[in-house]
């Protein structure tokens, strides 16, 4: 764990000490995953990992619970497995995906899973809302978006 400045810590949760090989998506599964904590507000930045690494993180002793989850792999079908989502237990999720992207991210199954867990009003998607800005003073969290979405 790295103390960035007083009251702000950053923990690298992935890649593992021994890189994953043979996962079917090694490049994604060895992506950097960070947990940033400022006061009582925490962010889990899940990068491009997929179910393989999410499962690994669930089975480790890392603290995953975070107020904000930046959903893994643009909300692809191979990410945000139920066990991982349950362990993170976010209040807010951000899905970063380009509008009309060729991969169809986020996958409807993942978007629905997040909606069921958090409610639509707590999910922010760059494909629909443009830039998503999260601001915290270490106690409260404010979210603003470039565009409104019904």
Protein language model regions, located:
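Non-globular, low-confidence helical/coil segments that flank catalytic cores
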Residues: 1-150
């Amino acid at each position: 764990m790295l103390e960035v400045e007083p009251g702000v810590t950053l923990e690298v949760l992935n890649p593992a000490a021994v890189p994953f090989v043979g996962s079917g998506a090694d490049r994604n599964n060895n992506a950097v995953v960070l947990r940033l904590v400022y006061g009582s507000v925490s962010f889990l930045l899940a990068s491009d990992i997929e179910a393989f690494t999410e499962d690994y993180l669930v089975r480790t002793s890392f603290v995953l619970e975070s107020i904000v989850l930046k959903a893994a792999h643009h909300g692809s079908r191979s990410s945000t497995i139920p066990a991982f989502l349950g362990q993170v237990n976010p209040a807010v999720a951000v899905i970063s995906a380009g509008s009309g992207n060729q991969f169809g991210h986020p996958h409807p199954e993942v978007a629905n899973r997040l909606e069921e867990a958090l409610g639509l009003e707590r999910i922010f998607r760059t494909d629909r809302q443009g830039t998503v800005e999260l601001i915290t003073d270490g106690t409260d969290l404010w979210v603003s978006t470039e565009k409104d979405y019904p």
